[in-house]
Each structure stands twice: as structure tokens, then as C-alpha cells.
């Protein structure tokens, strides 16, 4: 059977391994997952209650206007509901961006290593990809490539902070960069981890309201999968001017987010105590990972997220990941990104201590 020839160039996305499957495969009683940047403290109490209290609605299609969640997000960011689109994870908004602006005659731009789904969605359409020589975001390199290929480049993805490396740019530098980009080039600011960056350093905070008011060609992406502990519910959103949102709606399938997911997201936005606890614990535990890396002379990039990436010179990241896996610790090997590195999600105090214990045995 023949398929779209563009598919030959696509590598399937490598997701984190399932804990139950790992336990069965290796005969383990305990498995700790530090691979997918999920919230180690689970789901907020308010979100759980919303799921339970609305479970009886599971047989009904959701409100396709998603009015309640849009209103909550509009209030959070001080924007209009018309500036919002809700997706099944922010991945779906990335898909809308690619389909709205790109085809096989066009290109998009990103830094050397960034979220894999940008490239996967683009290559589905045969879109050309331009990447900077530097792995992390270098705005000078990005602008140089943009200037050289601006007739082709119609989308720029900035992942701030960057997944899977963890670095982040100051918001002021990002806004200066946007000033130099043509209005017909859509710039996507992927803020999946921006709440973490904003907590660590206010200079990294991207204000979506300010962004879309200053730049009619910008879209901000947010998610409930990380800080808000709803990775299993699949809820993300895009914030942009009405013209962009209206274009995305032409690509959206009806009822794309479930009843329970919408209710859980609204409740999660109202749980400030859970959010604050997550942020504070994340960065207190992050310090332990930084100290651990220094002790073992492991290279890392200071992270503004809920994960840290270790880079190796001699040790093989695949071998290390497999050894840890057999001992019940799941981390993300970054060989699929062309890196001899591993990404480790920041867990609970106990989970992190178990990682340090097993890593020390196998390094």
C-alpha cells in the first residue's frame, strides 16, 4: 500500500514509558517515572472533585463553545474569550499553526533542539525545517536564518522555556526580536513551562495580553499538563488576535476536549495553593539535582522548567537509561534528539532520592 511520501521523513514521537508496563516487564514492585515532566504531586484536590462530581455527564457531548473554561482563562490573562482556542493538549494548537500557515513550498524556523512535535507536524506536510547551529535559543542566529530565508519561513517556534533543554530567554529580548519579524510570519511562543520560568525569574515571564496586543502575528501556547497536573486529561490552549483564532477554528474538529477535561481545567485554575506548592517544591528539589551534577562533574543547562537535562561526554545515555529502567527509574533518553543526554523530571523528595541512589550505583 502506498502512503503519503512525506511520511518517510517523519520519526514517530517517543513518549515516556508506562509505569505498569515497566513493572510487569522487569518484575518490579516499585516504579518511579521521571520521564514525562508530569506533576509529581498528582492532580489538585479541586480538579479531582470536579472530575468526580461531573462523572455522570460522561455520556454527553461537551459544551463545544467551551465557554466556562474560556471565561476562566480570559479572567486569568485579562483578555477576551474571542482571543482563545482550546485544544486537546497544546500539541493540537501546534497542529493548527502548521496547517494554517505552512505547506510543502514553505518552511518554519526553530532553535537547534526543541519540542519534537513542531517538526513532526511540519514534515507531515512536507514543510522544510530551518534550525540554528546552537542547540539553545540564540536570537541572533534565529534572525540571521530568518533574514536569509524569509520568503520561505512563515512560522517561527520559540519554546520558552525550551523542552527538552530547559533554558529560557528574557521576555524583553523576545519582544525586541518580534519587532523585526514581518507581519505575515506567525511566531508561536510555546509557554508550556512558562509559569515555572516566571516563578524562578520574573524577567522570563511572557504576558500573553501584552504579546497579542503588540504583535498581531503572535500566538501564545499554554497547557494544563505540567503545572496543573492534568496530563491525562489533555487540555491546552492558544491565545492570539481574533483573525488567527478564527483561522484555527476552521481546522478544529467539534467536541475535541471532553466534558471532564474541561471541568477539571476550570477547577485547576482555581487551586492556587496546589500551584504554589508545586512551584516551590520544584525549585527546592531542582537545587539538589544541580548539586548532584556538580558533584559528578556532569554538564547541565540551568533549567527554568520542571526538569533538568544532563549531558555526558563518555557515559552513554542509552546504557544509563536502560540500567535505571531495570531498577525501576524511568527517565527520558535524548538520543532521539541526537544528544548523548538524559532529561529528568523533578519528582517528589522520595522519588528524587531514589534517582540519586540508582544513578550513583550505575554511573
UniProtKB/Swiss-Prot annotation:
Keywords: Amino-acid biosynthesis, Aminotransferase, Histidine biosynthesis, Pyridoxal phosphate, Transferase. It holds the Pfam family Aminotran_1_2. One of its GO terms (molecular function) is histidinol-phosphate transaminase activity. Its cofactor is pyridoxal 5'-phosphate. It catalyses: L-histidinol phosphate + 2-oxoglutarate = 3-(imidazol-4-yl)-2-oxopropyl phosphate + L-glutamate. Pathway: Amino-acid biosynthesis; L-histidine biosynthesis; L-histidine from 5-phospho-alpha-D-ribose 1-diphosphate: step 7/9. Its EC number is 2.6.1.9. The modification N6-(pyridoxal phosphate)lysine is found at residue 226. The keyword Cell membrane does not apply. It comes from the Bacteria. One of its GO terms (biological process) is L-histidine biosynthetic process. InterPro entries: Aminotransferase_I/II_large (IPR004839), HisP_aminotrans (IPR005861), HistidinolP_aminotransfase (IPR050106), PyrdxlP-dep_Trfase (IPR015424), PyrdxlP-dep_Trfase_major (IPR015421), PyrdxlP-dep_Trfase_small (IPR015422). Homodimer. Belongs to the class-II pyridoxal-phosphate-dependent aminotransferase family. Histidinol-phosphate aminotransferase subfamily. This is Histidinol-phosphate aminotransferase. It comes from Campylobacter lari (strain RM2100 / D67 / ATCC BAA-1060).
Amino acid at each position: 500500500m502506498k502512503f503519503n511520501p512525506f511520511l518517510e521523513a517523519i520519526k514517530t514521537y517517543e513518549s515516556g514509558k508506562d509505569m505498569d508496563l515497566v513493572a510487569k516487564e522487569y518484575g518490579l514492585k516499585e516504579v518511579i517515572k521521571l520521564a514525562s515532566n508530569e506533576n509529581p504531586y498528582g492532580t489538585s484536590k479541586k480538579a479531582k472533585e470536579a472530575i468526580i462530581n461531573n462523572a455522570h455527564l460522561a455520556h454527553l457531548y461537551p459544551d463545544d463553545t467551551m465557554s466556562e473554561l474560556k471565561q476562566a482563562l480570559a479572567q486569568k490573562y485579562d483578555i477576551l474569550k474571542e482571543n482563545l482556542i482550546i485544544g486537546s493538549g497544546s500539541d493540537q494548537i501546534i497542529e493548527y499553526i502548521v496547517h494554517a500557515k505552512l505547506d510543502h513550498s514553505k518552511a518554519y524556523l526553530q532553535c537547534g533542539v526543541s519540542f519534537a512535535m513542531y517538526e513532526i507536524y511540519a514534515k507531515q506536510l512536507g514543510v522544510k525545517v530551518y534550525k540554528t547551529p546552537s542547540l539553545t535559543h540564540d536570537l541572533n542566529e534565529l534572525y540571521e536564518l530568518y533574514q536569509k530565508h524569509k520568503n520561505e519561513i512563515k512560522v517561527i517556534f520559540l519554546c520558552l522555556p525550551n523542552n527538552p533543554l530547559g533554558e529560557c530567554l528574557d521576555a524583553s529580548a523576545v519582544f525586541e526580536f518580534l519587532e523585526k519579524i514581518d507581519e505575515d510570519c506567525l511566531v508561536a511562543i510555546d509557554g508550556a513551562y512558562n509559569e515555572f520560568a516566571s516563578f524562578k525569574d520574573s524577567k522570563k515571564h511572557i504576558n500573553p495580553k501584552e504579546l497579542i496586543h503588540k504583535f498581531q502575528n503572535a500566538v501564545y501556547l499554554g497547557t494544563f499538563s505540567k503545572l496543573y497536573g492534568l496530563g491525562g486529561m489533555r487540555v491546552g490552549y492558544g491565545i492570539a488576535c481574533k483573525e488567527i483564532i478564527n483561522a484555527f477554528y476552521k481546522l478544529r474538529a467539534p467536541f475535541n476536549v471532553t466534558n471532564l477535561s474541561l471541568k477539571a481545567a476550570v477547577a485547576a485554575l482555581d487551586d492556587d495553593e496546589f500551584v504554589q506548592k508545586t512551584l516551590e517544591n520544584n525549585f527546592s528539589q531542582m537545587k539538589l539535582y544541580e548539586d548532584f551534577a556538580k558533584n559528578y562533574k556532569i554538564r547541565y543547562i540551568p533549567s527554568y522548567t520542571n526538569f533538568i537535562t544532563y549531558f555526558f561526554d563518555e557515559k552513554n545515555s542509552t546504557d544509563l537509561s536502560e540500567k535505571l529502567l531495570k531498577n525501576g527509574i524511568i527517565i527520558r533518553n535524548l538520543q532521539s534528539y541526537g544528544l548523548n543526554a538524559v532529561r529528568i523530571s523533578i519528582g517528589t523528595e522520595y522519588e528524587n532520592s531514589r534517582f540519586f541512589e540508582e544513578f550513583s550505583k550505575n554511573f
